[in-house]
Amino acid sequence: MDVTIQHPWFKRTLGPFYPSRLFDQFFGEGLFEYDLLPFLSSTISPYYRQSLFRTVLDSGISEVRSDRDKFVIFLDVKHFSPEDLTVKVQEDFVEIHGKHNERQDDHGYISREFHRRYRLPSNVDQSALSCSLSADGMLTFSGPKVQSGLDAGHSERAIPVSREEKPSSAPSS
């Protein structure tokens, strides 16, 4: 007779609230301080996982702001140089792609690649879009909004990434 053995409900992972670390965005980075706190994992459960909210704040998640006057995207790309990044506007979308070939770091050899796609609001002036990379690795994509009723100018074009020598003024989460 086959019997399925399951962990008690209080020791099971909470599915979408605690996804597998396999899909976390920090493949080439070391452990965080809270990953090294053994008393948490042993006192709560052998299956304890750090809060997803905490790991989201520490990862390279982007921030999108859209107010009355402008549209801005902040994206942490600290492992990429401007030459590794491609920013394109196509119709109502901005596509940001980053890729660098295999290189050596503190933990061995690593290559990274990402692709992000964001919908632009219909009233963003696509002829005035800009993109810059700060000294601390924060990519800032921005564009002013036009008055309603004016043509925002939809076309496909590449946006050059300029390098800034100062750190980003984007808020850290």
Curated annotation (Swiss-Prot):
GO molecular function, one term: metal ion binding
Domain sHSP: 52-162
Subunit structure as annotated in this protein's UniProt entry: Heteromer composed of three CRYAA and one CRYAB subunits. Inter-subunit bridging via zinc ions enhances stability, which is crucial as there is no protein turn over in the lens. Can also form homodimers and homotetramers (dimers of dimers) which serve as the building blocks of homooligomers. Within homooligomers, the zinc-binding motif is created from residues of 3 different molecules. His-100 and Glu-102 from one molecule are ligands of the zinc ion, and His-107 and His-154 residues from additional molecules complete the site with tetrahedral coordination geometry.
Function: Contributes to the transparency and refractive index of the lens. Acts as a chaperone, preventing aggregation of various proteins under a wide range of stress conditions. Required for the correct formation of lens intermediate filaments as part of a complex composed of BFSP1, BFSP2 and CRYAA.
Glycosylation sites: 162
Family indicated by similarity: Belongs to the small heat shock protein (HSP20) family.
Biased composition (Basic and acidic residues): 153-167
Record protein name field: Alpha-crystallin A chain
Region (Disordered): 145-173
Deamidated glutamine sites (modified residues): 6, 50, 90, 147
